[in-house]
Amino acid sequence: MSENTTATTRARRKVREGLVVSDKMEKTVVVEVEDRVKHALYGKIMRRTSKLKVHDEQNSAGIGDRVLIMETRPLSATKRWRLVEILEKAK
């Protein structure tokens, strides 16, 4: 009569675009991501940046590259993002 269907659906992963600011670590790059936030009281649109550590398996990204990153499971104490693709190489 009653069916127990436990369909576990995975939540949508966050995807961000950012600029590589450091590539000094092995298989890790630091990406600066910009977020535009409206001030709660005054309504001004502000730019807020955050630096994220991103897993780069092939060590292919360099400083100044524009990259696409995706949220993933925790890979280390501070890494929760992985590199999806390099959108534009630095000149």
From Swiss-Prot:
Keywords: Ribonucleoprotein, Ribosomal protein, RNA-binding, rRNA-binding. InterPro entries: NA-bd_OB-fold, Ribosomal_uS17, Ribosomal_uS17_bact/chlr, Ribosomal_uS17_CS. GO terms for cellular component: cytosolic small ribosomal subunit. One of its GO terms (biological process) is translation. Pfam families: Ribosomal_S17 (PF00366). One of its GO terms (molecular function) is structural constituent of ribosome. The keyword Ribonucleoprotein applies. The keyword ATP-binding does not apply. One of the primary rRNA binding proteins, it binds specifically to the 5'-end of 16S ribosomal RNA. Part of the 30S ribosomal subunit. NCBIfam families: PRK05610.1, uS17_bact. Belongs to the universal ribosomal protein uS17 family. This is Small ribosomal subunit protein uS17.
